[in-house]
Design a protein with these regions (language model features):
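Bacterial Sec-dependent signal peptides at the C-terminal "C-region" and cleavage site
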Residues: 18-26
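Positively charged n-region of N-terminal signal peptides that target proteins for export
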Residues: 2-8
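Thioredoxin-like thiol-disulfide oxidoreductase module
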Residues: 71-74, 78-144, 163
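C-type cytochrome heme c attachment motif
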Residues: 55-62, 133-135
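Solvent-exposed loop/turn segments at secondary-structure junctions
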Residues: 54-59, 67, 88-93, 141-142, ...
Length: 165
């Protein structure tokens, strides 16, 4: 009897922790590593959502602090995409589609350099790159759409819903 009471007490103590971890996952976007998102999208009908940002970017921070915290945006992204956050000016090599991409000009913060993966997936707009940029890629690594600049909640929902079938 004493042993079963201890087990029951242990279960009751753990239940709130299980609920807490599940609710935490629903309150934020489940950002993945690129390799994991690639693996999952190859086996699924879900596309990857690649969010390219850079440090000290006002609009990138607005996306993170305003758009990506909205419950309806979180649900739409978590339910329909494999999201990945990528620093478009990273100095680290990035493996994508079994190919290594580097930043071949990692100069000072003032230099207009970009990671080669960013340059491969993001098309210039009016002879410029804009931050942040969202690129939707399917499991065959084909780009479906790209959108640049700050997207408020309504625009994010509208743009992403147009992709989800």
């Amino acid at each position: 009897y004493y042993c079963s009471m201890k087990k029951l007490l242990l279960i009751l103590l753990c239940l709130p922790l299980i609920g807490l971890t599940q609710s935490t996952n629903n309150n934020s976007i489940n950002w993945l590593e690129l390799a994991e998102a690639e693996r999952l999208s190859e086996k699924s009908s879900k596309n990857m959502l690649l969010f390219f940002y850079r440090e000290n970017c006002e609009y990138c921070e607005k996306m993170k602090s305003q758009t990506f915290i909205d419950p309806s945006v979180i649900k739409l992204i978590n339910d329909n995409f494999f999201p990945v956050m990528i620093n478009g000016k990273s100095k680290d090599p990035i493996i994508y589609n079994k190919e290594e991409f580097i930043n071949d000009k990692p100069n000072s913060e003032d230099e207009p350099y970009f990671h080669n993966l960013f340059k491969k997936l993001v098309e210039m707009k009016n002879d410029n790159y804009y931050w942040p940029t969202i690129v939707i890629v399917n499991g065959e690594k084909k780009k479906i759409i790209q959108g640049s600049g700050f997207w408020p909640k309504e625009q994010t929902l509208r743009n992403l819903r147009s992709i989800v079938k």
